Amino acid sequence: MAESFVVAKDLHKSFDGLKAVGGVSFTIYKGEIFGLLGPNGAGKTTTIRMLSTVLEPDRGDITIGGYSVLRNGDEARRLIGVCPQDLALYEDLSALDNLIFFGRMEGLDSKAARSQAMGNLELVGLEERAKEKVAKFSGGMKRRINLAIALMGRPQLLFLDEPTVGIDPQSRNNIFDTIEGLQKQGMTVLYTTHYMEEADRLCERVAIVDGGQIIALDTPHQLKSQIGSPDKVTLEDVFLNKTGRSLRD
């Protein structure tokens, strides 16, 4: 039986009386790529922020690697790497110095931070640009640096929040290849996106999210099988079937 690594139970979060997440529950298994698929404003980012200890839920519980996020937040946090939707970079620093800085923030000594930084830059295909300032990089390259930073400290669980928004095909494919390679090494991944084709390619299971709630959860194949032939139906069709509107509305 697969080992549970992330367990979210009945998560609720509101801001100024407006519900952002209402009763979300799911389990992510160790070594799985699990997707949250939904339009902007569906509650995906709020869910990740609760899971990563940035926000405390109004109600509900989260367990990561056996640790309760609410009661053992420091222990849970050490297992997590977060690649946020917004770029978290120092543009006046080089790619290498960015990674070293964030590695030191993770508690690595100087030698370990430099070693991991070079390894992560190679992983995302930017080792030859290590000494260049990030300000000179394209949007796609900055996204790849964002991912490399999230891997500093060698987390067991990686949160990726819309990591391919607005980037070029080469960088998108590099990010996909990197994620798939990390999974082969045992990494557990939570991937949020509003691009159905990304969820279909990468994720073993997908939770379709709308209005702060999960409206369907299964493998992409099974979700598509619910409404037609999996070879002819897309996850966009599934979303339309469940909500009556397009995923991109």
Which functions belong to the PLM regions below?
Residues 60-71, 75-76:
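Conserved ABC transporter NBD signature motif
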Residues 100, 104, 111-129:
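Conserved ABC ATPase "signature" region
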Residues 154:
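Conserved catalytic motifs of ABC-family nucleotide-binding domains
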Residues 158-161:
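Catalytic Walker B motif of ABC-type/P-loop ATPase nucleotide-binding domains
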Residues 217-218:
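ABC ATPase "signature
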